[in-house]
């Protein structure tokens, strides 16, 4: 029987994702904190936090799950044509904090943000530990787009992206796909299925199939220098 678990501030184990509610889809647990160890434990089991500023911490593992195989993002001809005209540059981990701030900025038709100050502090700590990473898009020296997420073995767990110029976030995603493929990553977790992600090539996997892939790749090895600050290039 599916039921909602309540967490305290001890670093206890998460319940199995199979116990998540079906309505709302994937809600598994409530409470706890955003301690780096708890966050890593969550992602290791296919669970992630997602909540509004005035809510308690909510933990999710939806069914189905949106995933990409690195290198399989669909780029339309119009997108490629547009990007070829740009002189943007791309970096890894050059401006993680600024990317998070960009992702947290208010958006049209959106009431508030789930990327609260507590979330920003928690993921910045994971970044300092070499576990959370960003891709940046620059127009000269102006940050115009980017994304961030966590690397768990050979799995990249995408969290959020933003843009201030058209197609900059899609460019960041293309860069991420190409980069992860070269670094030996096997899976990108895009979390919640939606039409936009599906239009870019995401697959909706049953949760149990996603968990099986996660278990297969979460302890995999990638190059130790994968996430040093560097400039990268978009291949079109």
Swiss-Prot record:
UniProt GO cellular component terms: cytoplasm
Protein task: Functions in the N-end rule pathway of protein degradation where it conjugates Leu, Phe and, less efficiently, Met from aminoacyl-tRNAs to the N-termini of proteins containing an N-terminal arginine or lysine.
Enzyme class name: transferase
Classification via Pfam families: Leu_Phe_trans
Main location, first listed in the record: cytoplasm
Source lineage: Bacteria, Pseudomonadati, Pseudomonadota, Gammaproteobacteria, Alteromonadales
Residue stretches in coiled coil: none
Keyword Protein biosynthesis among record annotations: no
Source organism: Shewanella sediminis (strain HAW-EB3)
Family of this protein: Belongs to the L/F-transferase family.
Location(s), subcellular: Cytoplasm
GO MF annotations in UniProt: leucyl-tRNA--protein transferase activity
Assigned EC number: 2.3.2.6
Catalytic activity line of the entry: N-terminal L-lysyl-[protein] + L-leucyl-tRNA(Leu) = N-terminal L-leucyl-L-lysyl-[protein] + tRNA(Leu) + H(+); N-terminal L-arginyl-[protein] + L-leucyl-tRNA(Leu) = N-terminal L-leucyl-L-arginyl-[protein] + tRNA(Leu) + H(+); L-phenylalanyl-tRNA(Phe) + an N-terminal L-alpha-aminoacyl-[protein] = an N-terminal L-phenylalanyl-L-alpha-aminoacyl-[protein] + tRNA(Phe)
HAMAP family: Leu_Phe_trans
Keywords: Acyltransferase, Cytoplasm, Transferase
UniProt protein name: Leucyl/phenylalanyl-tRNA--protein transferase
């Amino acid at each position: 029987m599916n039921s909602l678990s309540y967490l305290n501030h001890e670093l206890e184990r998460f319940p199995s994702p199979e116990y998540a509610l079906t309505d709302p889809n994937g809600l598994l647990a409530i409470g706890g904190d955003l301690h780096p160890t708890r966050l890593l434990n969550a992602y290791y089991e296919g669970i992630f936090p997602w909540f509004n500023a005035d809510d308690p911490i909510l933990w999710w593992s939806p069914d189905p799950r949106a995933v990409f195989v690195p290198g399989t993002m669909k780029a339309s001809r119009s997108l490629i044509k547009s990007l070829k005209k740009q002189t943007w540059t791309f970096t890894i981990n050059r401006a993680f904090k600024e990317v998070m701030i960009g992702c947290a900025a208010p958006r049209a038709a959106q009431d508030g943000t789930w990327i609260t100050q507590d979330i920003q502090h928690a993921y910045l700590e994971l970044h300092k530990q070499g576990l959370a990473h960003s891709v940046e898009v620059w127009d000269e020296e102006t940050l115009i787009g980017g994304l961030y997420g966590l690397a768990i073995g050979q799995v990249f767990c995408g969290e959020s992206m933003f843009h201030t110029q058209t197609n900059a976030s899609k460019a960041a995603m293309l860069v991420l796909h190409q980069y992860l493929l070269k670094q030996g990553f096997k899976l990108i977790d895009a979390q919640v299925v939606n039409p936009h992600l599906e239009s870019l090539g995401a697959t909706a996997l049953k949760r149990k199939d996603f968990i099986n892939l996660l278990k297969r790749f979460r302890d995999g090895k990638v190059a130790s220098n994968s996430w040093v600050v560097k400039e990268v290039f978009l291949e079109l």
